[in-house]
């Protein structure tokens, strides 16, 4: 993959317009891996490129927003606000090839976290409405494959969440038991 962490240059802008290049970038998103190259080309043509300046927000927790983002260059961090203290906690750092907002392609829930740029970043954005129209045109088989991919992604995330939850509960119990012995 080409180094896209540097500021925009004319060759990069041309590269972003290249449907074949874009179709290859979409392979980074599991949801699209089973789509044909021609389908990925059409998806790429529906999206746009967004430049997010350093410290600016790509999405804000709680805001309505229906669309997917693929990081083409730069680095962003994901923050979740603590409902008790209102403090923001960094959950993850994202880089080129990472994506976020996939669930909003079929879920109208507000954003669950804030994503901010650590450096100027370049994102491919795909609005949910445009993608829904694409799926309608592609037919039932493509829709079924997409939703099967979604189920796979959700089950993987659920397994990780379960593992993390169990680990955190074990740590809390160890800490609580140690405190009671003191």
Q: Where does each model-flagged region fall?
A:
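Cytosolic regulatory regions built on CNB/CRP/Popeye-like sensor folds
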Residues: 1-182
């Amino acid at each position: 993959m080409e180094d896209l962490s540097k500021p925009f240059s004319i060759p990069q802008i041309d590269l972003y317009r290249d449907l074949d290049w874009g179709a290859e970038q979409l392979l980074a998103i599991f949801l699209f891996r089973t789509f044909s190259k021609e389908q990925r080309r059409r998806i790429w043509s529906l999206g746009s490129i967004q430049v997010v300046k350093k410290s600016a927000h790509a999405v804000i927790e709680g805001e309505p927003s229906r669309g997917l983002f693929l990081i083409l260059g730069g680095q962003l961090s994901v923050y979740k606000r603590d409902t008790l203290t209102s403090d923001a906690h960094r959950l993850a750092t994202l880089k080129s090839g990472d994506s976020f907002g996939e669930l909003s392609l079929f879920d109208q829930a507000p954003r669950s976290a804030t994503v901010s740029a650590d450096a100027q970043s370049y994102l491919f954005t795909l609005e949910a409405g445009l993608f829904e129209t694409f799926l309608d045109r592609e037919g039932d088989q493509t829709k079924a494959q997409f939703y099967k991919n979604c189920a796979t992604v959700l089950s993987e995330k659920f397994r990780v969440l379960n593992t993390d939850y169990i680990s955190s509960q074990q740590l809390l119990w160890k800490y609580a038991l140690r405190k009671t012995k003191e």
